[in-house]
């Protein structure tokens, strides 16, 4: 039996949940979306229901989300200015990260 990789998504917009979320959800034999983090509660609730994520794994606060590692992999599909900060936090927790481009709009962060 093959391992099912667990996935978390930060940023439930057109890329995070509409593109990546849909891709992972359609391949249930390989992936399971286990947690979501999104500032907009309406999007968070909608995709939580659509992807069957338990209520206790839906976050509007990134600090609460990053209190512990929640999955094998993390998709970071937030605003560009937030990418570096979130990616560093994710790597500290040991996530495999799929980071939307660009890494940062600020050359000083490279």
Segments the model singles out, each with a brief description of its role:
Residues 1-52:
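N-terminal Rossmann-like dinucleotide-binding module
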Residues 53-110:
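Beta-loop-alpha module in the N-terminal Rossmann-like domain of NAD(P)-dependent dehydrogenases
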